Amino acid sequence: MIRFVLFISCFFLIGTVVECNKDGYLMEGDGCKMGCLTRKASYCVDQCKEVGGKDGYCYAWLSCYCYNMPDSVEIWDSKNNKCGKGK
């Protein structure tokens, strides 16, 4: 019984430390989507992994889209679009 409780405790601890379930477009410092039109094929995959994501691709050769990123990563959102609005 003690082993079962320890197993469950470890399972929940691991789940709370690294939550990687966020998908979306990577965002540049100016609030715009991270472009990939003129980049090499692995650019988006590399950028996604750099922020802790599992995988990514260049969506329609325009913007980097990532899978399974940590919840702490800020992603582009059409509702809060700051692109081109200045800081």
Curated annotation (Swiss-Prot):
Localization terms from the record: Secreted
Keyword match Disulfide bond: yes
CDD domains: neurotoxins_LC_scorpion
LCN-type CS-alpha/beta domain mapped to chain residues: 22-84
GO biological process, one term: defense response
Signal peptide: 1-20
GO annotations of cellular component type: extracellular region
Domain comment (free text): Has the structural arrangement of an alpha-helix connected to antiparallel beta-sheets by disulfide bonds (CS-alpha/beta).
Protein name: Alpha-toxin To2
Species this chain originates from: Tityus obscurus (Amazonian scorpion)
